[in-house]
Amino acid sequence: MMFEFLSLLCSGFFLVQRMSAHMGSYDKPFLCASPSYIVPQGQNVTLICDSHSKPNIFKVYKEDGFPILQLHEKTFTKSLDIGPVTPEYAGTYRCFHHQYPNEISAHSEPLKIIISGIYMKPFLIAPQTPLANSGENVTLECHSEIMFDTYILTSHRMEILKETLQHFQESHFSGSYASFTIGPMTPDHSGTYTCYGAYNHSLYEWSDSSDPVDIKITGEYKKPSLSSVMSPVLVSEQNMTLSCISNHQFEMFHLSREGVPQGKGIPAMQSHSGKFEAKFLLSPVIQKGNYRCYGSFKNSSHVWSSPSDPLYLPAKDNLKNLHIQIGLLVTMVLVIVVIIIIIIIIIIIIYYYYFSKKSSILEQESEVKATINRQDPERQEEHKVTYIEFEQRIFNKNLMPPISQSPKEFSIDTVVYTEVMI
């Protein structure tokens, strides 16, 4: 990995050059680009050249690659706007004094102008949480479907490019990527990172910028405290307010869930007790997890305090779903109970109908027997003897007993003879 540290804040750059001017390089001008030496294709860039010599009339030229006609024989004082830039503008530039036609001063140090947006942007993959503890190492990966020869990682603080890290690509099955390890982390490593891809044959022509990743350093100050204004047991459709309080004179407070920042910071307010506080209003739909808060200052927004103790919040959606599930369960139980009651009622009706009918039949039979007994009470004592003979389907019924066996006195005994003639 090759590290190249560049400062593109022109005032700071000039301060360093003025210090070196007193050390023997008085006639040498210095050159920088504003707002950055990485210029998106189609935009303009301002070249600034300055020195202690008077009068300050300069010329600038491009050392390599295609010549820029816009710069040919053009003089300027201190600044020169060029663009809209194309890939031909990529390269190394120098400036020099042009006081008299035959007098040319020493040339400035080279300034690289890089044109971005030539290729499709890569993707910068950050750690699971963008919050890094002081002293840790952080690994960022730049991925692309294009087989770039090299990747460049840039760090921005206060919208100014601070550092460029270059790493050769590593092939994988779906393109190429490069890993960048940063650390041990200090406040100087915090900031916004982006990455680019490029080819070795045109190192001044980069891809479009990846989406930015913010890396924040924690643990630089004492931790605040986080609490809920109301009970942490959430009620459906009810907002939750979290309060972050500290004795430290923080200017901003930040909220995170499971290590991921939640929205932007909130300005701190001093309470009646003299403490500094910020209140975070959460929407009715809350994701469950451990919440923490941090304190910071406006002039170093990427440097945070140690995290507060965690405050666990359940998800309101889960409670709502639980209420729905309980309601469905109660409804199912009621339906089952109603079905069971209906079945029991049907069984009782069938049972009642069956035994009512049987009782009616038994009563009718009892009435018939009682009627017969009332009509002929002495008949029960009669002795009946029946003889049946079958002969050609002719029936003869003799109610008279044989003469030889007839007693002299009348007898109530009756013998019935029946002959059947077949």
From Swiss-Prot:
UniProt-recorded name of the protein: Killer cell immunoglobulin-like receptor 3DL1
The keyword Transferase is assigned to this record: no
Its membrane topology: Single-pass type I membrane protein
Ranges per topology, Cytoplasmic: 351-422
GO cellular component: plasma membrane
Matching SUPFAM superfamilies: Immunoglobulin
Subcellular location: Cell membrane
Domain of life: Eukaryota
Species of provenance: Rattus norvegicus
Signal peptide boundaries: 1-21
Keyword set, alphabetical order: Cell membrane, Disulfide bond, Glycoprotein, Immunoglobulin domain, Membrane, Receptor, Repeat, Signal, Transmembrane, Transmembrane helix
GO MF annotation, one: molecular adaptor activity
Residues bearing carbohydrate: 44, 137, 200, 239, 299
Domain Ig-like C2-type: 42-100, 135-202, 237-300
Disulfide bonds: 49-95, 142-195, 244-293
One protein family per Pfam: ig
Record family assignment: Belongs to the immunoglobulin superfamily.
Function according to Swiss-Prot or TrEMBL: Receptor on natural killer (NK) cells. Inhibits the activity of NK cells thus preventing cell lysis.
Any single biological process term in GO: natural killer cell mediated cytotoxicity
Transmembrane domains' residue ranges: 330-350
